């Protein structure tokens, strides 16, 4: 029995089927190759994750450092502002005290050089004395203190020697007399006390 020959239409159809199968195989092979290229080994994936983790850590560290610097800047600004306010307050108080000291000096001189035996002047002197005390009490509330070193050792930080007097009654460098009181403001010198200082008498 002789082989049955295919008609031309069947041959065309068979060729088309073969071509389609070849195309499908090529597509499958290409897809497999692309997938293989995209796939990474577990070691490579772990290495990539570690790299991403390090980047994330560095980002967090940078952000934390920025927050710390910003907080430090804010604290420095707050401290400087507080210092500026304190300096302004002290400067205003110092200026006020320096303006007031000559007034107190004049009132004290009025008492010192007045005729204390004059009965007519006694009420006036008492009033002036009360005024001086009120002034001193008022400024003391703001940290102003009197420097009246009568009988104390001379201290060049708070005293200004106007004259030196020989004396056998006290040790050398003792304040014999206070010509003008000094004042401090919160421990800082406003005005030195003007004094007479002793020295050893000649033998």
Curated annotation (Swiss-Prot):
Subcellular location per the Swiss-Prot or TrEMBL entry: Cytoplasm
CC annotations in GO: cytosol
Stored Gene3D superfamilies: 3.90.20.20, Head domain of nucleotide exchange factor GrpE
Full protein name: Protein GrpE
PANTHER family in UniProt: GRPE PROTEIN, GRPE PROTEIN HOMOLOG, MITOCHONDRIAL
Domain of life: Bacteria
Keywords: Chaperone, Cytoplasm, Stress response
Subunit structure: Homodimer.
An example Gene Ontology molecular-function term: adenyl-nucleotide exchange factor activity
GO biological process: protein folding
CDD domains: GrpE (cd00446)
Role description: Participates actively in the response to hyperosmotic and heat shock by preventing the aggregation of stress-denatured proteins, in association with DnaK and GrpE. It is the nucleotide exchange factor for DnaK and may function as a thermosensor. Unfolded proteins bind initially to DnaJ; upon interaction with the DnaJ-bound protein, DnaK hydrolyzes its bound ATP, resulting in the formation of a stable complex. GrpE releases ADP from DnaK; ATP binding to DnaK triggers the release of the substrate protein, thus completing the reaction cycle.
């Amino acid at each position: 029995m002789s082989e049955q020959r295919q008609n031309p239409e069947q041959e065309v159809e068979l060729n088309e089927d073969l071509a389609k199968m070849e195309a499908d195989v090529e597509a499958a092979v290409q897809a497999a190759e692309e997938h293989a290229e995209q796939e990474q080994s577990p070691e490579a994936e772990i290495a990539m994750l570690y790299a991403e983790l390090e980047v994330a850590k560095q980002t967090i560290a940078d952000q934390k450092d920025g927050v710390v610097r910003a907080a430090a800047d804010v604290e420095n600004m707050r401290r400087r502002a507080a210092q500026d306010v304190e300096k302004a307050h002290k400067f205003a108080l110092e200026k006020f005290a320096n303006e007031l000291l000559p007034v107190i000096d004049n009132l004290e001189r009025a008492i010192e050089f007045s005729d204390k035996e004059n009965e007519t002047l006694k009420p006036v002197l008492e009033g002036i004395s009360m005024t001086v005390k009120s002034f001193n009490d008022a400024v003391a509330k703001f940290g102003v203190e009197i420097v009246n070193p009568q009988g104390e050792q001379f201290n060049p930080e708070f005293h200004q020697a106007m004259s030196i007097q020989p004396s056998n009654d006290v040790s050398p460098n003792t304040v014999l007399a206070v010509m003008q009181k000094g004042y401090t403001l919160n421990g800082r010198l406003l005005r030195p006390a003007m004094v007479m200082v002793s020295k050893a008498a000649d033998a």
